[in-house]
């Protein structure tokens, strides 16, 4: 997840980060930036991928981030690169509109690095980390309901569903019940307060994942509508890439990777024919897979940056076929999330 998204040797949900770009060599190899080309980095963070792209070729980069702190922190890189970098405060589901507004469409490449950044984890006041006491916030763009709002407002069944669906937490019902019981005594407004509640329900052996990891993941994804945003960004990239343009996506857990895998699988297959319908109708493939399956980090990278162990990279090249209609995108999401996109815009 770029400089500011890769983290160091402690737990990804809360420890101090060293800001190491994850799978940087693999990202550059699959993105293949060109001189005079234009690439879009949809998740700027602290600019690790963006800087590397600018150093790899004498082209232009448009970098997007929904977090205003990241945009402010990138101004020095804008000045350093002599006008080849444009920073935009926006959600990456709108990346096609950003490129069009800047007169940069169609694009030669799009890179997406999904999830929370280590900068956000490092700042206790952002409320992402269960290891750092802070307000239970988790909003990447400081708009809309916070994690504390969800914890206060969702009923027990809804909480359990969020924690199970978005955190893949098998103790979701017990955790939801504990949250409801605890909030009846006093409001849950601090990160460590919630982490303590979860830790009393989920036990972990020394060296295992912190008990609150999956619950925090679920709330963060829900607060920021991360899966809906990812689906929107994939479709936006399909619309704005030129033929031969590359899409590279790095994910860090199975929910994200499954969406990317299914999207690229569907977009890279020709319509199926059968003896009943020998001339199958349907959209032509809009992508060609560059990486056959997921690319994973090497052992040396994982040893130096343990968070990289869960990273998966998928890459594809745009064909000259028209973009597919958006009607089938909802199938990439859990059913109850497919109708919730676009409630908020930062």
From Swiss-Prot:
The keyword Cytoplasm applies. It is found in: Cytoplasm. It comes from Azorhizobium caulinodans (strain ATCC 43989 / DSM 5975 / JCM 20966 / LMG 6465 / NBRC 14845 / NCIMB 13405 / ORS 571). One of its GO terms (molecular function) is rRNA (cytosine-N4-)-methyltransferase activity. GO terms for biological process: rRNA base methylation. This is Ribosomal RNA small subunit methyltransferase H. The gene is rsmH. Its EC number is 2.1.1.199. It comes from the Bacteria. Belongs to the methyltransferase superfamily. RsmH family. Keywords: Cytoplasm, Methyltransferase, rRNA processing, S-adenosyl-L-methionine, Transferase. S-adenosyl-L-methionine binds at residues 47-49, 65, 92, 113, 120. Its main location: cytoplasm. Pfam families: Methyltransf_5. Residues 294-346 are annotated as: Disordered. GO terms for cellular component: cytoplasm. Residues 328-337 have a biased composition (Low complexity). SUPFAM superfamilies: Putative methyltransferase TM0872, insert domain, S-adenosyl-L-methionine-dependent methyltransferases. Residues 314-327 have a biased composition (Basic and acidic residues).
């Amino acid at each position: 997840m770029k400089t500011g998204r890769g983290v160091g040797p402690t737990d990804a949900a809360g420890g101090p980060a060293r800001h190491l770009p994850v799978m940087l060599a693999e990202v550059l190899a699959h993105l293949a930036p060109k001189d005079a080309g234009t690439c879009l980095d949809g998740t700027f963070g602290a600019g690790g991928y963006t800087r590397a792209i600018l150093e790899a070729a004498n082209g232009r980069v448009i970098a997007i981030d929904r977090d205003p702190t990241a945009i402010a922190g990138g101004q020095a890189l804008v000045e350093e690169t002599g006008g080849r970098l444009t920073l935009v405060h926006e959600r990456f589901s709108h990346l096609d509109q950003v490129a069009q507004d800047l007169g940069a469409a169609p694009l030669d490449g799009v890179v997406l690095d999904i999830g929370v950044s280590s900068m956000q984890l490092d700042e206790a006041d952002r409320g992402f980390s269960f290891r750092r006491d802070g307000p239970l916030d988790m909003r990447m763009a400081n708009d809309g309901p916070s994690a504390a709002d969800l914890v206060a407002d969702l009923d027990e069944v809804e909480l359990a569903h969020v924690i199970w669906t978005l955190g893949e937490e098998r103790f979701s019902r017990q955790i939801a019940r504990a949250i409801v019981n605890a909030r009846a005594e006093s409001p849950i407004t601090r990160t460590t307060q919630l982490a303590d509640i979860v830790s009393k329900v989920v036990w972990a052996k020394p060296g295992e994942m912190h008990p609150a990891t999956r619950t925090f993941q679920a709330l963060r994804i829900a607060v920021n509508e991360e899966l809906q945003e990812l689906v929107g960004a994939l479709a936006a990239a399909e619309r704005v890439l030129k033929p031969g343009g590359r899409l590279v996506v790095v994910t860090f857990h199975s929910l994200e990777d499954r969406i990317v895998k299914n999207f690229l699988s569907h977009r890279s297959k020709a319509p199926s024919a059968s003896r009943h319908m020998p001339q199958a109708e349907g959209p032509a493939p809009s992508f060609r897979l560059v990486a056959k399956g997921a690319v994973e980090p090497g052992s040396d990278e994982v040893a130096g940056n343990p968070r990289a162990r869960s990273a998966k990279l998928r890459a594809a090249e745009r064909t000259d076929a028209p973009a597919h209609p958006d009607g089938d995108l909802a199938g990439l999401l859990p059913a109850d999330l497919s109708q919730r996109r676009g409630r908020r815009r930062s």
